[in-house]
Regions:
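Catalytic-core segment of enzymes that process non-peptidic bonds
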Residues: 149-150, 154-158
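Short Gly/Pro-enriched turn/cap motifs at secondary-structure boundaries
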Residues: 138, 158-159
Length: 270
């Protein structure tokens, strides 16, 4: 039946797996909860199961898969296959994720790279970045990732961790980010922090229809905030305006630094 390939996106909320043929045609896809608070072996098992399900859904077996692409958030030692301290994964500290996944998948070759970089390169080769040689890519989800294509090549940096665009500081001494810095764009404009700011506002006594959601579910999601924006909620508008402003500042700063032909957005918030 021919060879097929697996691409895994390890996100802070979901693991997303795609199964492709050699011409990059998507044959099947699977999404499963990451359970980022769990230990590394649980996260690896979740990735492996989602991969096997994706291949089965496409009508193939794992014997037809010569290699697996794994995109993970940084910082990491990508050439060594080690996640050092991924911001939204509290248990992943100096974890040999490439070896662990390869062992679980019976020795499959694992190509390990920054999640935003591989998404950026995918858009450059086959998506919204086709036709340009210089582009900036943002992925908006639990966190904010980035990738930069310069003169047709992916910018990796001296330590493989270039283009951590979500951790560009846009408000000095601002909100505390999960990375430990204050004022990062991610601390304002990511899905998790959009929801967090709305929750904090409600807890401080601001009025909003979101209060019913918080009381019922015990939490608010980014989708909840945007759903209530559509319904005309004033707090939701305030929060999403702040998110949009943070993204605009981030884009302007990145534009001045890189002068891209195109800026591409992707991720769960899009």
């Amino acid at each position: 039946m021919g060879e097929i390939f697996i691409g895994i996106d390890l996100g802070g909320t979901f693991i997303k797996v795609g199964c492709f043929d050699s011409k990059l045609k998507l044959l099947a896809k699977i999404s499963a909860p990451t359970k980022a608070e769990k230990q590394a072996k649980v996260i690896v098992e979740n990735m492996a199961k989602a991969s096997e399900q994706s291949v089965a859904k496409a009508g193939f077996s794992m014997d037809d898969v010569p290699a697996v692409g794994l995109g993970c958030p940084g910082p990491a030692k990508y050439s060594e296959g080690i996640i050092e301290a991924a911001t939204n994964f509290p248990t992943l500290r100096n974890v040999p994720i490439r070896r662990m996944l390869s062992d679980r998948l019976s020795g499959k070759t694992i190509v390990f790279e920054n999640d935003a970089n591989v998404a950026c390169f995918g858009e450059f080769v086959a998506g919204a970045g086709k036709g340009v040689e210089d582009m900036v890519f943002f992925t908006l989800g639990t966190g904010i990732g980035g990738g930069i294509i310069n003169k047709g090549k992916l910018l990796a940096g001296a330590g493989d961790n270039a283009a951590e665009l979500g951790h560009i500081i846009i408000y000095p001494d601002g909100r505390l980010c999960n990375c430990g810095q204050k004022g990062c764009a991610e601390a304002y404009a990511s899905a998790s922090n959009t929801a967090k700011r709305a929750t904090e506002a409600l807890q401080a006594g601001e009025k909003s229809s979101l209060k019913k959601v918080l009381d019922k579910n015990g939490q608010i999601t980014c989708k909840d905030v945007y759903d209530h924006l559509k319904a005309g909620d004033k707090l939701a508008k305030k929060i999403t305006d702040e998110t949009a402003k943070a993204l605009a500042i981030l884009c302007i700063n990145t534009l001045h630094a890189t002068e891209p032909q195109r800026i591409v957005f992707a991720g769960g918030m899009i």
